[in-house]
Curated annotation (Swiss-Prot):
Family: Belongs to the NrdI family.
Domain of life: Bacteria
GO molecular function term, any single one: FMN binding
InterPro entries registered for this protein in UniProt: Flavoprotein-like_sf, RNR_Ib_NrdI_bac, RNR_NrdI
Name this polypeptide is given: Protein NrdI
GN (gene name): nrdI
Function: Probably involved in ribonucleotide reductase function.
Any GO BP: protein modification process
A UniProt-annotated Pfam family: Flavodoxin_NdrI
Origin organism lineage: Bacteria, Pseudomonadati, Pseudomonadota, Gammaproteobacteria, Enterobacterales
């Protein structure tokens, strides 16, 4: 199975989701000066920012990571977290990344996710990679 790449802010909601998920994952550093480069196809798990608008929905660190063409071409799908309080903008970062990078928006979950979200993502990620050539 290929990997998951994720970003988690200092709130650590996405980090806690990843820990509960129990699948191999690489974290995009919080410190913007630190960089990572992936070497295999991956699914990106990302929180949504911006208080409900499109501008600022994708964290700067994730933008910088995806601006590296090597990282961008290996992206196969995106999963977004968010807050339902933002209505239609719930999980907006997933929509923005999927559209701009031409990959499927696979799932969204609220804050650090529920047990049902964990099970759905674990199953969905496994099935997604099984369908890939």
């Amino acid at each position: 199975m290929s990997q998951l790449v994720y970003f988690s802010s200092s709130s650590e909601n996405t980090q806690r989701f990843i820990e509960r998920l129990g699948l191999p994952a690489v974290r995009i550093p919080l410190n913007e000066r630190e960089r990572i480069q992936v070497d295999e196809p991956y699914i990106l798990i990302v929180p949504s920012y911006g208080g409900g608008g499109t501008a600022g929905a994708v964290p700067r660190q994730v933008i910088r990571f995806l601006n590296d063409e090597h990282n961008r071409v290996l992206l196969r799908g995106v999963i977004a977290s968010g807050n339902r309080n933002f209505g239609e903008a719930y999980g907006r970062a997933g929509d923005v990344i999927a559209r701009k990078c031409g990959v499927p928006w696979l799932y969204r979950f609220e804050l650090m996710g529920t047990q049902s979200d964990i099970e759905n993502v674990r199953k969905g990620v496994t099935e997604f990679w099984q369908r890939q050539p």
